[in-house]
Each structure stands twice: as structure tokens, then as C-alpha cells.
Amino acid sequence: MEIENHKEEVPFAHYEGLFRELDPREVTARVTDVTFEEGAFRVTLLGRTFAISHPDCVFTALDGGSLPPLPTRTFLLRYLLESKTLPFGGSWKTFREMPWGEMYIKPYTGRVLTRAAFTFGTRVNAFRAAAQKLGATALSHGDAGFQFDLIGPYRMQILVWEGDDEFPPNAQVLYSENFADGFAPEDRVVAGDILISTIKANM
């Protein structure tokens, strides 16, 4: 494969190589929401199920829709390679409160918090409609707030506040506490990015 977009294609090619060496039995024992059927892993992200053939790593959207962008496919490969099923205990954490959160807070703030604030806080009704379309659970916090089932037992909440003449729009993103041990910090950033992009695509 000729690499043109190094920022996205080089990481994908790296994890694609590791994916080819996976033992499907080890993966499905470690990540119990994933199944392996007819030579392919099946994994559900934000309500959409994808088949990823093994070992050749061909993605198929089982709903017949479009394939996710390359960073999302890389995220799914990393989920199969590195994550594990950890039960959700019912508590929530900010990104900063999780391990290495302070080190990654600057890219996280730009890619997730600021983006969520100005994408959704300026169009609260459209955000609400998109979240409902995705099957999210409405929350009583913020001007609009919703809880999303991201992948497996991992949940995320987005709360938005509409801006006015005095204050800019604002947003908070919360992670189910199992993210702290189930995902590397860079994957928590990507999870926020994926969630925002998915909601935006439905607005």
C-alpha cells in the first residue's frame, strides 16, 4: 500500500499488521462483547455493527451503510488488540481524572471539549434531535445532555450549555469509570472525537 496520508494511514497499517497475528479465541475471551463468526470479528460501535475479516482485515458495515473513516477503523483495531471487558460500576470520570489525563489534556480540550461546545452549544435543538436519533438516553443536566453506549460496556455522556451574549457555549464530556483501565489515554481522546463526529453527522 502506498502511504499518502501519513497521519492516518501509517497508524492504520501498523495496527493492521498486528491484527493479522491475533488469535480470535484470545480476543473473544478478553473482549466479551466481540464475536468471531465466519472468519470475521463482529464489533458494535455506537449502534452500528461492523465485520472485520481475519486475517485480511477487510471492514464491512453490516447495516449496508458507509464504512467509518480510517481513524475510527484504527480505533476498532486497537480495541480488539488492547482493550478488555470491564464492567461499568455506575460512576463517571472526566478525562482529566483518569490516568495520564493531565498529560493529554491540551489535545483533548481542543479535539473534544471545545469542539463539542461550539458544534452542539450553538445548535442545541439539532444536537438533541441527533442524540435521540442515535438512541441516546436523555439526562437532566445542562441545557441538553445525553448518555451514549459507545462500545461494549463503555459509556459516555455529553452535556452542553448554550452560549449567550455574556458567556460562550460550553460542554462537558464524562466517561464511565471503566475507561480508566480499559483504554489508553490517546484512545479516550479518539473516543470523544468519534462520538462528536457521529452526532454531528446526524445533525
How does the language model describe each region?
Residues M1-G39, T72, L80-L134:
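Short Lys/Arg-enriched alpha/beta "domain-start" segment
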Residues V27-H54, T137-E162:
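Amphipathic, interaction-prone secondary-structure segments
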Residues T122-D181:
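Conserved binding-pocket/active-site segment within a compact domain
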